Amino acid sequence: MKRDRGRRKKKICSFCVDKIAVIDYKDTPRLKKYITERGKILPRRITGNCAHHQRMLTVSIKRSRHMALLPFSTD
């Protein structure tokens, strides 16, 4: 049987709405919203970010992990 899933609202990039030009790796509270409890970076289709900001977000999270501001994973 086929389920009716309905129309989903288009997600918008929160960085574009706030007009943030640069995503800072030191802004850990904002970066934590885009990481799962296992430490994985959430994909674009779930977060709703545009491609430009998703790439910047990924680089910032990786820098933050390297500087030990964010964990690589939770054991």
Swiss-Prot record:
Gene3D superfamilies: Ribosomal protein S18. GO terms for biological process: translation. Keywords: Ribonucleoprotein, Ribosomal protein, RNA-binding, rRNA-binding. SUPFAM superfamilies: Ribosomal protein S18 (SSF46911). GO terms for molecular function: small ribosomal subunit rRNA binding; structural constituent of ribosome. The keyword tRNA-binding does not apply. One of its GO terms (cellular component) is cytosolic small ribosomal subunit. Part of the 30S ribosomal subunit. Forms a tight heterodimer with protein bS6. Belongs to the bacterial ribosomal protein bS18 family. Binds as a heterodimer with protein bS6 to the central domain of the 16S rRNA, where it helps stabilize the platform of the 30S subunit. HAMAP family: Ribosomal_bS18 (MF_00270). This is Small ribosomal subunit protein bS18. It comes from Desulforudis audaxviator (strain MP104C). The lineage of its organism: Bacteria, Bacillati, Bacillota, Clostridia, Thermoanaerobacterales. The gene is rpsR.
